């Protein structure tokens, strides 16, 4: 199966780890997302490799990628599979009024996550606010 991913290069404003969720800052650079960004439309995508401040890194802005996850009890729960920004560049289950930016892609070996685990997600950006 072929996947169409959209990946672009951006300059980092600060240190970014591989598979961090990132956002635009006021200078047009990218920075790691935090939990406060769950209600922000500035979320851009998922860093495809780590970098230091001032370096360039590739960011997946639409498509399938690995991502850092928070503790998600059960991927099969419809509310838990819709993801938003969480602490330290992670994705976690979206709450009401959060921008849903991705959905988890579970498989037989991956049905839940502990805090800091990596998982496969479909990232589509901040287009829907969870009601």
Name each model-derived stretch.
Residues 1-131:
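Surface-exposed, low-hydrophobicity beta-strand/loop segments enriched in small/polar/acidic residues
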């Amino acid at each position: 199966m072929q996947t169409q991913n959209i990946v672009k290069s951006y300059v980092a404003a600060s240190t970014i780890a591989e598979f961090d969720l990132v956002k635009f800052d006021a200078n047009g650079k990218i920075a790691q997302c935090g939990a406060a960004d769950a209600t922000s439309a500035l979320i851009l995508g998922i860093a495809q490799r780590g970098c230091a401040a001032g370096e360039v890194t590739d960011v997946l802005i639409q498509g399938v990628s690995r991502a850092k996850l928070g503790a998600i009890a059960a991927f099969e729960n419809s509310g838990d599979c819709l993801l938003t920004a969480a602490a330290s560049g992670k994705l976690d289950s979206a709450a009401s009024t959060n921008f849903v930016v991705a959905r988890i892609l579970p498989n037989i070996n991956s049905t839940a996550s502990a805090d800091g685990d990596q998982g496969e997600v479909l990232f589509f950006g901040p287009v829907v606010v969870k009601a």
